[in-house]
Amino acid sequence: MFKRFSKKKEAPEDPKNLINIDKPIKELPASIAIPKEKPLTGEQQKMYDEVLKHFSNPDLKVYTSEKNKSEDDLKPLEEEEKAWLTRECFLRYLRATKWVLKDCIDRITMTLAWRREFGISHLGEEHGDKITADLVAVENESGKQVILGYENDARPILYLKPGRQNTKTSHRQVQHLVFMLERVIDFMPAGQDSLALLIDFKDYPDVPKVPGNSKIPPIGVGKEVLHILQTHYPERLGKALLTNIPWLAWTFLKLIHPFIDPLTREKLVFDEPFVKYVPKNELDSLYGGDLKFKYNHDVYWPALVETAREKRDHYFKRFQSFGGIVGLSEVDLRGTHEKLLYPVKSESSTV
């Protein structure tokens, strides 16, 4: 079960060192190194090759819904889905399923169906996604979720602030979270495919309380979000730092504890100084960093949407230029180099 630790006091702000900022940080700073990838064993490589072969089949069809399945709902892979089916995607699912081949293939297939049904299978609204920036914009008017900076291992940071909740509980809140997860993935540098969550449960008096609504989500919503994160974003969470946790939030965490898989629990850090995990020049000054960040929705939101779209455009153009095939590496797709660092086996690849 979760253990509660006494919160350490963070150093006060030094106004002389603060950096005023109101938009996302576009690129990973040169001072942060990306950890090296652990090489695959011979057996792991064989399993990877089998997964690649399966999803490279030109006759492959996938359901358009995670739960409601019929033969009429089987559709071939679209170009954007092939761009999602990367080398690192296969490895994430293989690790999450403990290298059980059938489980891995089934999980990826299920996620493809879920992404179609949820409305995010086209890698951005410019390609046809139903979850758009305009749809969820109202959810972020209070700045309850913010993508800002990178932590020590080059993971982009997504701040979650339940205390800035500004809307009633609805499916749109889940859509908003998924939208932000997709956007923080856009910000990942070449060589890093996981993210960091910084979750602050502090209450913010400047955000009016929504009548009849708790700032701690209902258990049903919590379970749905956990299902999405653990099933459809496996191995994406690198670290989750939680702070200012009130008793109500502890109660919520205890209630959802049985639904959190052991690997996810290991990545949760409670009430430790954020500066232990994030460089000060990448961290909000509220948590001991040097970034004097103030959320202005009219400034931040358009900048986030535009920057993320630029990154997706870069990714997709490189996907097409490298052959538009399943199994390309995110290192190559997010990078700027001209030649493939991770070429796909020609006998397995297909357009």
Swiss-Prot record:
It catalyses: a 1,2-diacyl-sn-glycero-3-phospho-(1D-myo-inositol)(in) = a 1,2-diacyl-sn-glycero-3-phospho-(1D-myo-inositol)(out). One of its GO terms (molecular function) is sterol binding. It is found in: Lipid droplet; Microsome membrane; Endoplasmic reticulum membrane. Keywords: Endoplasmic reticulum, Lipid droplet, Lipid transport, Membrane, Microsome, Transport. It is a peripheral membrane protein. Homodimer. Apo-SFH3 forms a dimer through the hydrophobic interaction of gating helices. Binding of phosphatidylinositol leads to dissociation of the dimer into monomers in a reversible manner. This is Phosphatidylinositol transfer protein PDR16. It comes from Saccharomyces cerevisiae (strain ATCC 204508 / S288c) (Baker's yeast).
